[in-house]
Amino acid sequence: MSISANKTFDRPGVADYEKRRYRGLDQRFVDSREKRILRRILCGLKKKGGPAWEREGAVLILDAPCGYGRFSKLLLDEGARLVSSDLAFHMVERAVEKKEGLRHVGGVAADFRRGLPFKPGVFDYVFSMRLFHHLHPEEDREAVLREFARVAKEGVILSFYRVRGLHALQRKLRRLFKRTQRTIKMVPGATFQKEAAGAGFTIERVVPLFRGIHAQHIAVLKKRGGAGKRP
């Protein structure tokens, strides 16, 4: 993802990020684990979703932030149509130019904290990986959740970092020895539940990336009040 770091990506920067980001053994393991969990989640949604998921291209998903399109193929392989969005224009451009299939509708650059350029309820789901641990102010997380609730008809699949002492210590040591100032936002489970509820969601499921070790969790949020008709 790229909305987090206040960094402007040009095309060479995107190419370099894509090449380097998941090159290490530990990061390849994380990437594989994330995708395994997400496939199980999507499989569960398809079973609950009925006929809509059975018709190829009937379900429309917003990937926000899309980054360079790391999850595009995974989402399209489940039969959904896909729209990619990110703060960085060249990230969106890269995600779209991969042309994973005709069901990859297109993309748009947007700052989710300020609003998405879409009509209410136009998407069935919003998919948001590796965004929320970069949103430090509570009001930013709440604003993004409200915006996701506005454009999603069914719900949201997103990741967040839940407070975990072991992972927090590991991050602290990494900053100490690598002299990096980059920090991530971990929130208590109760705080995440409150913020989700405030935006109109109930939490259906939360899956830890690595239970007891890693702070990242992947949550399935259901929009309260049932699904409405897509405009």
Regions found by a protein language model. Name each.
Residues 62, 68-114:
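Class I SAM-dependent methyltransferase SAM/SAH-binding core
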Residues 1-49:
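Conserved class I S-adenosyl-L-methionine
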Residues 154-161:
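Conserved beta-strand signature within the Rossmann-like core of class I S-adenosyl-L-methionine
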Residues 183-199:
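Short alpha-helix
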Residues 165-182:
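Short, glycine-/aromatic-enriched active-site segment of Class I SAM-dependent methyltransferases
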Residues 127:
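A conserved beta-strand element that flanks and buttresses the S-adenosyl-L-methionine
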Residues 142-154:
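A short glycine-rich, Lys/Arg-flanked "PGG" loop and its adjoining helix->strand segment in the class I
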Residues 115-120:
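Short conserved loop adjoining the S-adenosyl-L-methionine
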